[in-house]
């Protein structure tokens, strides 16, 4: 084990990359429970307006919003399900916010904690894109991450599930990018080179392999 760690640190010394930044939602937090609760809240709020919505309709509205790179996916879904009627959309949106505003459904992705430990043991600096740091503390993983990376963007690898919110800005800043296809954004596909990640993964094992490839590149 010690020889493995020393070998990994030697690899890092030769690499341009010093840090890995994780967008927590999707890559670290599965978000399955959150997405199910949100979709249920949207259906319930529509029902209170007399709009009958089934899971297939919610899934279709979600897919349309994701494919269109909608800046506010929830609003886009509600607009689709409510036929775009402004006052109805506003009421449904308020109800959904009331139903989900205090919801905290953090689900640590299986295997990700062990990967974080291995990456840190290799000498990589780990960053977290997560506005609610207490969620990481409750999940027992806050200690893996630093508040201030102190690493130039060109020395960073970004792992995120969304092309629009994660991959595009990271590429623009000069980071290497890995799309973790999961949950609501698993079907999002790039429309141009600027939206295309350096790699795509669907599980933790693939993620670790790609990170090592980038470090070795």
Residue ranges and their predicted role:
Residues 1-20, 33, 87, 113, ...:
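Asp-based, Mg2+/Mn2+-dependent phosphohydrolase catalytic module
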């Amino acid at each position: 084990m010690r020889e493995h760690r020393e070998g990994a640190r030697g690899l890092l010394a030769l690499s341009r990359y010093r840090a890995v930044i994780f967008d927590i939602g999707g890559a670290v937090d599965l978000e399955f429970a959150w997405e199910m609760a949100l979709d249920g809240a949207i259906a319930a709020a529509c029902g209170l307006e007399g709009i009958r919505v089934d899971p297939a309709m919610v899934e279709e509205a979600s897919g349309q919003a994701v494919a269109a790179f909608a800046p506010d996916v929830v609003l886009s879904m509600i607009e689709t399900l409510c036929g775009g009627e402004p006052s109805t959309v506003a009421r449904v949106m308020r109800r959904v916010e009331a139903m989900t505003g205090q919801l905290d459904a953090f689900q640590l992705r299986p295997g990700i904690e062990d990967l974080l430990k291995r990456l840190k043991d290799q000498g990589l600096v780990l960053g977290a894109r997560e506005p609610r740091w207490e969620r990481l503390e409750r999940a027992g993983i806050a200690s893996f991450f630093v508040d201030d990376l102190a690493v130039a963007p060109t020395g960073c690898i970004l792992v995120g599930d969304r092309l629009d919110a994660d991959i595009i800005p990271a590429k623009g800043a000069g980071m290497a990018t890995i799309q973790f296809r999961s949950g609501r954004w698993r079907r999002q596909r790039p429309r141009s080179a600027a939206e295309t990640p350096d790699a795509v993964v669907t599980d933790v094992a693939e993620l670790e392999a790609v990170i090592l490839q980038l470090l070795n590149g």
